[in-house]
Amino acid sequence: MQIAFNTYIKNDICWLINGISPDVLKEMFDAIHENRNCEVVRSGYYKRILRYTHDRESFYIKRYTVRNGLESVKSIFSLSKARREWNCAHKLLGSQLLTATPVAVGEKRRFGMLKDCYIISKAIPNSTTVKELLIAFRQSSVHALKKNTLLNNLISYVKMVHDHGIFHGELHTENMLTDVDNITLFYLLDLGRTVFKK
């Protein structure tokens, strides 16, 4: 896996990229600011998530905004939320565990203090959250064996993650995806609070 620093800077955001070209990043970032080709997944004051599609490949873009001056000062001495999530995703992938592949992380700082940060990850095709799958199973006449298989796979997966010394911090069924055709494959999402004990 080759990581390359990108010299593309717009609006004082410095980007680290892996897996997309600077041209695609520029196009994506321009689209974000012009609100085109983007679907708003979640929009809060401090966190915004967009889905962007480029050449039939989808990406999720998370933007975190610093809450207050104290958090901005603390950011001089700590990693941004986006950078923590970037690092955790690469550690998970290095441990042969699945997550959304991060392709870019960007930070906007002034005098070393963080203003906002971004992480861009590839969307996981053919997947659904474990929560959505459990709701679908409950509302349909899915055979009990399939339900039990999913639950047993999920329990085994969570045990395996913990056996690797990985503690998610926000482990719940909305932060886990599964492949709709293969319910033995799970992906962890929202890794910002993940701790690696081993």
Region annotations inferred by a language model:
Residues 24-131, 159, 163-164:
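Conserved ATP-binding subdomain of kinase catalytic cores across diverse folds
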Residues 129-141:
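AlphaC helix of the protein kinase catalytic domain
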Residues 73, 140-146:
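Surface-exposed cleft-lining segments at the edges of enzyme active sites
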Residues 1-39:
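Juxta-kinase regulatory segment immediately upstream of eukaryotic protein kinase catalytic domains
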Residues 174-198:
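Catalytic activation segment of kinase domains across protein kinase-like and atypical kinase folds
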